[in-house]
Curated annotation (Swiss-Prot):
This is Mediator of RNA polymerase II transcription subunit 5. The keyword Cytoplasm does not apply. It is found in: Nucleus. It comes from Emericella nidulans (strain FGSC A4 / ATCC 38163 / CBS 112.46 / NRRL 194 / M139) (Aspergillus nidulans). The gene is nut1. Keywords: Activator, Nucleus, Transcription, Transcription regulation. Component of the Mediator complex.
Length: 1054
């Protein structure tokens, strides 16, 4: 029979390792002698691997691809047969891991095929993209159907893994993930061909489109997190061709030139009511900016305000002043902490006046500032902001009695109003006068610091003052730090960093004027490129300086839960990133390099055997190397003590060396590891707890070290508290845990991440009706009621944006948005007169900044998309925010309008309002009505305003100066990053490039296969063990190195 002769032929070719060119010539001869159908030939090829007894033979996909390009077998036939014989159908028993299934599989009866499947599918993708195969409409239809079957099979396998107690599902199998990605790319490539577009666009192929839509609907949710670029491409494909897996009778949507006509007609029919700027709108927005890490970006704020108020600058000024006083008043009523009160107060007194002054500095932009302030002050709550004379007759809290005066003097200091107006605006004689020297100027402060470095310490102590000078101080200190980084003046830089680290509230105020990225990027670059051989003299001062700078970076990172982009770090090779992600994990001795083993031994000897830490010990080990060894040092030392090889007093005495100022920052890493060790260990925790007690509450510590030690405890206290409470629950009779918890208690309020307190969460979640979402709706209603009388000087309703943030983080943005839409619908139906106010409040909540996505907002605002390189990637954010949820709902409006017309209309109106508020900045030419009897046409460039604020609007962390750090590794690092970034190209271009590479030479001369777990070659060379390889990396590999497709396999499998 022909099949027997072909089977023997294929087996001999595999046995003798016949290359592609010779296989093509031999197979052409055999076709003349023994003709065979493409399905039978494909089956024969796939069954031939059973005879080899190995899981992966790289020649088999080469032979299949060769036959496809010869036209002897068709792609849809190959995909169908491949799926039929694939081990993706295997169902592991509950509790069995994927590796064991592969290991125990019997090759001749049940061969593991995923690596072969991956390579064949990738070859198919490349041949389709090059136009070599799948040329007819019928082939395209059959290929689409085969791809849909593959997707459904992979999803079914993933679900079976979950059902078999494999919580990782597909994530537990690198090969399955790569197969999942390959099938998705194949679908994307086919859909991008001319014939593919014809099939997806034509009405007669509706059954095929339904089949593809059902597969896509199952594929996209899993793809979203694993392969975002591929998800975006397929998601666009689904929307473009309406591939939702339903027949047109259910969708009832008219498509014309790929435009949803019904959707456009419906949106056009939705009429907007008058735009209302509720008093609650800015109240919500400012609360959201300041509730956790200060999310203040001048460009974003100014753009939001202009979008909200357009040319009405007098209204803008009055409303933001009123809202800032309202936020401060609300904080007092809610008994917010003193540090929160200081931040709100500083925003009003230190931030707003220079912000207004910068606006006025733009030519021809004028507004009656004194009148705006007067109107605003007439609307604030007099019980919270009493006059000086009223303060003595008040029985309540008069802590904010001087805020009005502070604000007015700050405005006068910035030349917004004359000093003589203060008495009239206050309604009484002020209790102070303007300082003789006027407001601080940033450049003058920089000059003072350069002349006398001790001046920096004095200025830092003034950051928390409320005299209107904080912005100039922050600008000067930040730029001086940048200059010191460039000059490598680390001694002075150390003193500034120490001063800032021990003043966490000053850091809050700094973020009103500079982003974390702007402050920290030069510091992180300095630490990452710190060369040990550059430093001369004693090593202890270098450790001291390095540790102080690092401690400030860690203080920012842990206080505000910053991510790498916020720190200004782009490379995964960064020491800072490695320390944060890996520093608290200890290593086994056999995992250490020879250098690390030597350093570890010398540090153990210095701490526990010698009489102190010698110069030789430190000079042999750079600070970066030491910090990465701390966890292992603790693991080995504590293990020796627990094994009885080291006395506890010796252990304690050795660790006390780490309480010296030059080593103290390393306790951040040490305490983190120690807390994890205590929490994870099932052994008796006595020795680890005694060690922790000695480090948290040392019996003696120097005055200089005490401040650093407090900063270390601030950083680590929250995680230690959670771990110790869990250990106490497991060991309720232990009495040695409470003293540690008591020592940590004063530090627990260090973090500022907008997380709610337990005392807040309980009433929200127990709210009747509706729990947390019900409590949000109740708050929403109180905001509407308050906004119905915007000119009355009444107390604002109790509000904290923590409520919304908590709901987003726990319930998800989609459910929160649904609750807001429910309330909007209720207000529209029950009280149409407040519908406009309700819409503005909802839009303000949706538009409000969120820390998780704020970096993305900054990137979008400051990034020049017209001139940017494709390599510049927007930072990812790990949460689905309200804007994302609203966009998703807006896409469903056509279908929703058939079921719930009013809700669909509300979504359209809310979507329009949010887009108006968040519209990107542009050159604007507003018509300014100054209530002065004339209209003035002004070309107001927002960039000019930002420049007048003396703030950097670039968003990349560099001030208005060249931040060339003059460090040896900069050029190399930039080259590496550029090489990496150049791989991030447009998906369409990648496909074209990959096709061009394939067209060069597909003759393959492969080495022997093996029984390894890696994944083949070609575009299938996804990297041995590289699970998260992106589409761009995979395909660009072929583009940059066509020989990548022809690599010899020898040595790749072990």
């Amino acid at each position: 029979m022909a099949s027997e002769q072909w089977r023997a032929f294929v087996q001999r070719c595999l046995l003798h390792r016949i290359d592609a060119a010779e296989f093509r010539d031999l197979s052409m001869l055999l076709f003349q002698r023994c003709p065979i159908g493409d399905l039978l030939l494909t089956e024969t090829l796939l069954q031939a691997r059973l005879a080899t007894g190995i899981k992966w033979d790289p020649l088999l996909p080469v032979y299949i691809d060769c036959l496809c390009r010869m036209g002897r077998v068709q792609i849809p036939t190959v995909l169908t047969a491949l799926l039929k014989h694939s081990s993706i159908h295997d169902k592991p028993s509950p509790g069995a891991d994927v590796a064991s299934v592969k290991k125990n599989a019997k090759p001749r009866a049940k061969c593991y095929t995923l690596m072969t499947d991956i390579r064949v599918i990738q070859d198919a993708m490349l041949s389709i993209n090059s136009g070599t195969t799948v040329k007819t409409l019928l082939e395209v239809i059959h290929t689409f159907c085969a791809i849909a079957d593959w997707i459904q099979a992979i999803i079914a396998w993933h679900n079976s893994q979950l059902d078999a107690d494999q919580p990782a599902g597909m994530m537990g199998s690198p090969d399955a993930m790569l197969l999942f990605e390959a099938v998705g790319i194949l679908l994307s490539v086919l859909a991008g061909t001319g014939k593919g577009i014809e099939v997806l666009s034509a009405g007669p192929h509706e059954a095929t489109k339904i089949r593809i839509g059902q597969a896509l609907s199952a594929y996209l949710p899993l793809c979203a997190d694993m392969y975002p670029p591929l998800h975006n491409r397929l998601d666009g494909l689904q929307k473009q061709f309406n591939l939702y897996g339903q027949p047109p009778s259910k969708l009832d949507v008219t498509m014309m030139d790929n435009v949803n006509v019904n959707a456009l007609q419906f949106e056009a029919s939705v009429m907007d009511g008058p735009t209302i700027h509720s008093r609650a709108g800015l109240y919500i927005y400012i609360n959201a900016m300041l509730v956790g890490r200060p999310l203040v970006d001048d460009s974003i704020l100014l753009n939001y305000l202009y979008n909200r108020y357009a040319e009405h600058y007098d209204v803008l000024i009055e409303e933001i002043i009123t809202a800032s006083f309202d936020v401060l008043s609300n904080a007092m009523y809610r008994n917010e902490s003193a540090r929160t009160m200081l931040l709100f107060r500083s925003f009003l007194v230190n931030k707003l006046p220079p912000f207004f002054a910068a606006m006025l500095a733009v030519p021809m932009v004028t507004f009656p500032m004194e009148e705006c302030i007067s109107h605003a002050l007439s609307r604030i709550d007099p019980n919270i902001f009493p006059s000086f004379s009223q303060m003595f007759s008040m029985q309540g809290n008069a802590a904010l009695s001087d805020v009005r005066q502070e604000f007015l003097f700050s405005c006068a200091s910035h030349k917004l109003i004359p000093e003589s107006s203060i008495e009239r605006l206050l309604g009484e004689n002020p209790m102070q006068t303007l300082p003789v020297g006027g407001s601080y100027m940033k450049d003058e402060l920089k000059a003072q610091i350069s002349a006398n470095h001790e001046r920096a310490e004095q200025l830092i102590s003034d950051i928390e003052s409320t005299e209107g000078n904080a912005g100039a101080i922050v600008g000067a200190i930040t730029e001086v730090m940048h200059d010191l980084c460039m000059q490598k003046e680390t001694m002075t830089l150390k003193n500034i960093c120490n001063s800032l680290s021990r003043r966490p509230q000053s850091l809050d105020v700094m973020l009103l004027f500079r982003s974390p990225r702007q402050i920290l990027q030069p510091l992180c670059a300095l630490l990452d490129s710190w060369h040990w051989d550059e430093d001369q003299g004693e090593s202890q001062p270098v450790y001291d300086e390095f540790g102080s700078i690092l401690l400030l970076v860690l203080t920012f990172k842990y206080r505000y839960d910053l991510r790498p982009w916020d720190l200004g770090i782009a490379s995964n090779d960064s020491f800072i990133i490695k320390l944060i992600e890996q520093g608290s994990s200890s290593q086994k001795l056999d995992e250490l390099t020879e250098k690390q083993n030597k350093n570890l031994g010398e540090w153990i000897a210095a701490l526990f055997i010698a009489e102190g830490i010698s110069e030789e010990t430190m000079s042999a080990c750079s600070p970066q190397e030491f910090y990465m060894l701390v966890s292992t040092l603790f693991s080995q030392s504590l293990g020796a003590c627990e094994a009885g090889k080291l006395e506890f007093d010796t252990l304690k005495g050795g660790f006390e060396y780490l309480l010296e100022p030059f080593l103290l920052p390393s306790l951040v890493v040490a305490l983190t590891w120690l807390g994890n060790h205590i929490w994870e260990s099932e052994a008796d925790p006595t020795i680890p707890l005694r060690t922790l007690q000695s480090l948290v509450s040392p019996s003696s510590i120097s005055g200089e070290a005490r401040e650093i030690h407090l900063t270390v405890l601030n950083i680590t206290s929250r995680s230690l508290e959670e771990q110790l409470k869990d250990v106490r629950a497991r060991h309720p009779t232990r009495t040695d845990i409470k003293p540690i918890l008591d020592a940590l208690d004063p530090c627990l309020s260090f973090q500022r991440t907008a997380s709610c307190h337990k005392s807040e969460l309980e009433p929200w979640t127990t709210h009747n009706p509706g729990g947390l979402l019900g409590s949000i709706r109740a708050t929403f209603q109180s905001l509407i009621l308050w906004s119905t009388s915007p000119d009355v000087s009444m107390a604002p309703p109790s509000y904290t944006h923590r409520q919304v943030i908590t709901a987003i983080r726990t319930l998800g943005a989609s459910r929160v948005l649904a609750a807001l839409l429910d309330e909007l619908k209720f207000q529209t139906e029950s009280n149409p007169g407040t519908a406009g106010i309700a819409l503005d409040i909802a839009a303000s909540i949706v538009s409000a900044p969120l820390s998780e996505s704020f970096a993305f907002d900054q990137f979008q605002t400051h990034h020049d998309h017209s001139t940017s390189k494709e390599s510049e990637q927007a930072p990812h954010y790990p949460i689905f925010n309200l804007r994302d949820a609203l966009n998703t709902q807006h896409e469903l409006v056509p279908k929703l309008s058939e079921k719930d017309l009013l809700r669909a209309e509300i979504i359209v109106r809310l979507y329009r309002r949010v887009n108006t508020l968040l519209a990107p900045p542009a050159q604007v030419a507003p018509n300014l009505d100054m209530n002065m009897g004339m209209n003035v046409n002004v070309n107001m460039n927002m960039n000019n305003i930002i420049g007048d604020m003396h703030l950097d609007s670039s968003g990349d962390g560099a001030s208005n100066q060249n931040m060339n750090m003059n460090m040896e590794t900069d050029t190399r690092t930039q080259a590496q990053e550029q090489g990496h970034n150049n791989e991030q190209a447009n998906l369409n271009q990648i496909m074209d490039n990959a096709a061009a590479a394939v067209g060069m030479d597909m003759d393959m001369n492969m080495g022997g296969g093996g029984d390894g777990m890696g994944v083949g070659v070609g575009v299938g060379e996804l990297g041995l063990g590289e699970v998260d390889q992106s589409i761009d990396d995979v395909l660009n590999a072929a583009e940059m190195n066509p020989e990548f497709l022809d690599l010899d396999m020898e040595g790749m499998f072990q």
